Amino acid sequence: MKGLIGRKIGMTRIFTDEGISIPITIIQVEPNIITQVKSIQTDGYYAYQVTTGTKKPNLVIKPEAGHFAKAGTKAGRSLWEFRLKHEEKPINIGEILTLEYFTNIKKVDITGTSKGKGFSGTVKRWNFHMQDASHGNSLSHRVTGSIGQNQTPGKVFKGKKMAGHMGNKRVTIQNLDIIRIDLRKNLLLIKGAIPGAPGNDLIIKPAIKLSH
């Protein structure tokens, strides 16, 4: 198995026996139900597809309803896929994956969607230095400045840092410590901050690059 889907609840802190404050993010990991198993023969690669949570019946479109019915499960919030390098131990449709998977894992990689900040200037978006506040400067305090040269090359280079939509992007944070696991309440307590607003879905995987 490669990972699970969870939902960000929010942040708080806990104290160690020595009185040290640790900032933590609380993630609710409801049971993940396998809805499809893919193989080289049928799909060209190995993977398993999961769903979690619930969705109002009036929001489930017919293709989704048929897919969930074929898997013998209720409609979940969405569908996620975890690709496998090779065929692992048998995974069955309808099988339930729980937080117990992480009981012997100390570090995880978590992927989420960062908070959207709307259209932002270069000072906020890229941490550009502001121009002079006075000394003849007028109306150009937060202006980007030059974005290129002249006739040669006669263009703005691709990737130039400029104003634009900030946030609302897929972000992965690696090597996050697992502080505590509550199997009874399906809660995963992670040290530090995680991208996204409370309520966002998160992809949780065992750390691929363990730090020493």
UniProtKB/Swiss-Prot annotation:
Domain of life from the UniProt record:
Bacteria
A Pfam family of the record is: Ribosomal_L3
Q: Which GO terms describe its molecular function?
A: rRNA binding; structural constituent of ribosome
Q: Does the keyword Ribonucleoprotein apply?
A: yes
Positions of region (Disordered): 139-161
The biased composition feature labelled Polar residues covers 139-153
Q: How is it modified after translation?
A: Methylated by PrmB.
List keywords of the entry alphabetically: Methylation, Ribonucleoprotein, Ribosomal protein, RNA-binding, rRNA-binding
Residues annotated as carrying N5-methylglutamine in the record are 151
- What GO terms describe the biological role, i.e. biological process, of this protein? translation
| InterPro entries with a match to the protein in the record | Ribosomal_uL3, Ribosomal_uL3_bac/org-type, Ribosomal_uL3_CS, Transl_B-barrel_sf
Q: List cellular component terms (GO).
A: cytosolic large ribosomal subunit
PANTHER family assigned: 50S RIBOSOMAL PROTEIN L3 (PTHR11229), LARGE RIBOSOMAL SUBUNIT PROTEIN UL3C (PTHR11229:SF16)
Concerning its family, UniProt says:
Belongs to the universal ribosomal protein uL3 family.
| NCBIfam families for this protein | L3_bact
What binding partners and quaternary form does the record give?
Part of the 50S ribosomal subunit. Forms a cluster with proteins L14 and L19.
The record's function comment reads: One of the primary rRNA binding proteins, it binds directly near the 3'-end of the 23S rRNA, where it nucleates assembly of the 50S subunit.
**HAMAP family (alphabetical):** Ribosomal_uL3_B
The name this protein carries in UniProt is Large ribosomal subunit protein uL3
Origin organism is Baumannia cicadellinicola subsp. Homalodisca coagulata
